[in-house]
Amino acid sequence: MQPHETFTGSYQPGDVEFLLKPVVIEMTPVDQKEELIQSGKKHYSDMLSQEPAPTQWHLDLFHRALDRGAERLAKEVTQLAISLAERFGDEPIVLASLVRAGVPLGVMLHQALRDMGKTSWHYGISIIRDRGIDGAALDVIEERHGTSGIVFVDGWTGKGAITGELVRALKDRPGYPEQPR
C-alpha cells in the first residue's frame, strides 16, 4: 500500500484511519444489481447503488432507538474496553474494524480505551465475502504495530461468512492465533 493522506471519512481525525484505496465506480440501480448478483454475472462487491438520504421517519426511528439503547450501548462498550485492557495489559491495542459495520463500534471502543488511558490505534480495513481481506492494509498495520495487539472488530455477524473469510485470510499469515481476536 502506497503512502497516503490519512482518510477518516465522516469521523473525527484520531478516531479511525481508513486503509482503503479510493475507487471510482459507476452506480448500478438496486433492481439491476440484485438481478446481476442472483444470476452470478457480477459479485456484490463490484457494484454500488446510490443510497437515498434517510427520510424523516427513518431519522425519528433512529433517534428513538438511540434514546432507548444509548445507556446499554455505553455500558457494553465500556465493559468490552475494560476486558480488552485487562487482556492486553500494558500492550497497546490495535483495533482493525471491518468496513463498514465494524467501524462505529471500533470508534466507540477506541474512544473508551483512550478515556481509560489505554494506548490504542484504530483502522478501518476491507474484507469481502468470497474475496478475502485486504492484505495490503494488513501489511500496513503489521508493519506499524506487529500482530500481537490486533483485535478485529465487526458490528454485524449474520451467518458467519465474514468470520470465515477472516479465519481463512489469517491462517497463512504469521503471528495470528487460530481464532482471530
Predicted features by range, described:
Residues 1-181:
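PRPP-associated nucleotide enzymes
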